From Swiss-Prot:
Predominant subcellular localization, coarse grouping: secreted
Gene Ontology CC annotations of this record: azurophil granule lumen; collagen-containing extracellular matrix; extracellular exosome; extracellular region; extracellular space; Golgi lumen
Post-translational modification: ADP-ribosylation drastically reduces cytotoxic and antibacterial activities, and enhances IL8 production. Phosphorylation at Tyr-85 has been found in some cancer cell lines, and interferes with ADP-ribosylation.
UniProt modified residues of type ADP-ribosylarginine: R78, R88
Pfam families membership: Defensin_1, Defensin_propep
Protein name (database record): Neutrophil defensin 1
Keyword Phosphoprotein: yes
GO biological process, one term: innate immune response in mucosa
Family designation: Belongs to the alpha-defensin family.
Phosphotyrosine: modified positions: Y85
Name of encoding gene: DEFA1
Length: 94
């Protein structure tokens, strides 16, 4: 029974240690000023494209679908750059 209590205490300390950086980051994001363009106040998307990573064959872009994802691209996609949306960095995946 004592071992179970010790393991539970270690688990709670580990969870609390991980939660503190998340709370600090959430506070930083909330404190950051909104980056909203005057002409389009709803959405601001900034893309950084690395041309050296782009597909070389013109036909290969025909059916390419790209998305901004957090935290990383899913299986079968490749990261081609970075998106900035609502002050957060997203992976630009195709």
């Amino acid at each position: 029974m004592r071992t179970l209590a010790i393991l539970a205490a270690i688990l709670l300390v580990a969870l609390q240690a991980q939660a503190e950086p998340l709370q600090a980051r959430a506070d930083e994001v909330a404190a950051a000023p909104e980056q909203i363009a005057a002409d389009i106040p709803e959405v601001v998307v900034s893309l950084a494209w690395d041309e050296s990573l782009a597909p070389k064959h013109p036909g290969s872009r025909k059916n390419m679908a790209c998305y901004c994802r957090i935290p990383a691209c899913i299986a079968g996609e490749r990261r081609y750059g970075t998106c900035i949306y609502q002050g957060r960095l997203w992976a630009f995946c195709c």
